UniProtKB/Swiss-Prot annotation:
Protein name as catalogued: tRNA U34 carboxymethyltransferase
Residues reported to bind carboxy-S-adenosyl-L-methionine: 91, 105, 110, 130, 181-182, 196, 200, 315
GO molecular function: transferase activity, transferring alkyl or aryl (other than methyl) groups
Organism: Pectobacterium atrosepticum (strain SCRI 1043 / ATCC BAA-672) (Erwinia carotovora subsp. atroseptica)
Family to which this protein belongs: Belongs to the class I-like SAM-binding methyltransferase superfamily. CmoB family.
Length: 327
C-alpha cells in the first residue's frame, strides 16, 4: 500500500513535526478501514509502472519528463496503458517520456493566471487544499518550494499523483495525503496555503476560510480561487439541487462579497487579482477524461448560462495574508 514513511521523516525535524502526534495513526486507520473499492486495481497499475529517473525535467513551464536514451515504443505503450487505468485524469497536463496526458482541465492556464500575483514560492512550505492529481504541487516545486504538501480525500487522485511521482524518479519534494482539511489539526506552519476550486463545495464557507487561516504561519499568504458571480458585497448565489450539473455547490459569492468574508475571518491585505470566465477550451472532454465536461453543462442556446439557468462559471483569484510580519 501507499508508504508515507518518507514524508514522516522529512517533517520530523521541521515546523510540521508536531503533526506526527496524530498523522501516522490517522493514515494507518485510513489504509485499514477506508480504502475505495477500486483502490487495489489502481494501486496494481501504480506498482507495475517502471521506476524511471528523467535526465531532463521541466517543472517551470510544464510538467515534462524526458530521458536519454529514450525508452522503447513498447515501454511507452506499456506506461500509457497503465496510466489509462487511472482515468479519468482531470487536472494536468503531464508529458511523461512521450506519453501526453491530455487532462480535462488546462491547469497550466490557471497557474499562469495565479503565479504573477503571489509571493515568490522559493524556500516556502506550501499546503494545497483539494490538490487533485497534484499538478500544481509540481509547478510549486518548479518555483523552488522547500516542500509542497497536497491534501485531497479522493483516492484516485492519490494514485495518479504517486504514478507521476514514480515516473519523476520518486521525487520527494511534493506529497499528497488522502485527507480533507477538516481532518487537519491547526498546524500554523505553512508559508503559503492554496485553496483552488474548493470553497463552493463547502457547506460552511466561512469555516473553510478559518480552517485555511489556521494552517498558515503568522504573516503567511492565502491564495484562494473559486467560483464567483457579478454583484456587490451583498450578492451571493445559493444554487438549487445542481449548478453546472454539480450537486455539491452551496455558495457562490461575488468577488467583493468574498473580500468581505476574508476580512471577517481576520485576513488582511485582501486583493482580487484575477477574474476569468471558464471556457470550453480550458475545461473539456478528452480521451483521458471521456465523460461529460463543461460543454454539456452550459445552455446550448445561451453559453452565458448553465443548463439550470444560472450564470456560467466565472472564477476569481484572491490573495490575502494572515496578520503578522510579512514573510
Amino acid at each position: 500500500m501507499i508508504d508515507f514513511g518518507n514524508f514522516y521523516q522529512q517533517i520530523a525535524k521541521g515546523p510540521l513535526s508536531h503533526w506526527l502526534n496524530t498523522l501516522p495513526s490517522q493514515l494507518s486507520s485510513w489504509q485499514q478501514e477506508s480504502l475505495h473499492g477500486k483502490f487495489k486495481l489502481w494501486f496494481n497499475s501504480l506498482e507495475h509502472l517502471p521506476s524511471l529517473k528523467p535526465t531532463s525535467l521541466d517543472l517551470n513551464d510544464s510538467v515534462t519528463a524526458r530521458i536519454e536514451p529514450d525508452i522503447s515504443v513498447g515501454q511507452r505503450e506499456g506506461i500509457e496503458k497503465l496510466l489509462r487505468n487511472l482515468m479519468p485524469w482531470r487536472k494536468g497536463p503531464f508529458s511523461l517520456y512521450g506519453v501526453d496526458i491530455n487532462t480535462e482541465w488546462r491547469s497550466d492556464w490557471k497557474w499562469q493566471r495565479v503565479l504573477p500575483h503571489i509571493s515568490p514560492l522559493k524556500n516556502r512550505l506550501i499546503l494545497d487544499v483539494g490538490c487533485g492529481s497534484g499538478y500544481h504541487l509540481w509547478r510549486m516545486v518548479g518555483e523552488g518550494a522547500t516542500m509542497a504538501v497536497g491534501i485531497d480525500p479522493m483516492q484516485l487522485f492519490l494514485c495518479q499523483f504517486e504514478a507521476v511521482r514514480k515516473l519523476l524518479g520518486d521525487d520527494q519534494r511534493a506529497h499528497v495525503l488522502p485527507l480533507g482539511i477538516e481532518q487537519l489539526p491547526e498546524l500554523a506552519a505553512f508559508d503559503t496555503v492554496f485553496s483552488m476550486g474548493v470553497l463552493y463545495h463547502r457547506r460552511s464557507p466561512l469555516d473553510h476560510l478559518w480552517q485555511l487561516k489556521n494552517q498558515l504561519v503568522a504573516g503567511g499568504e492565502l491564495v484562494l480561487e473559486t467560483l464567483v458571480i457579478e454583484g456587490d458585497e451583498n450578492q451571493v448565489l445559493v444554487p438549487g439541487e445542481r449548478y453546472a450539473q454539480m450537486r455539491n455547490v452551496y455558495f457562490i459569492p461575488s468577488a467583493v462579497a468574498l473580500t468581505t468574508w476574508l476580512e471577517k475571518c481576520g485576513f488582511v491585505d485582501v486583493r482580487i487579482v484575477d477574474i476569468c470566465t471558464t471556457t470550453t477550451q480550458e475545461q473539456r472532454r478528452t480521451d483521458w477524461m471521456i465523460t461529460e465536461s463543461l460543454a454539456e453543462f452550459l445552455d446550448p442556446e445561451d453559453p452565458t448560462k448553465t443548463v439550470e439557468g444560472y450564470p456560467a462559471p466565472v472564477r476569481a483569484v484572491l490573495v490575502a495574508r494572515k496578520p503578522g510580519a510579512e514573510l
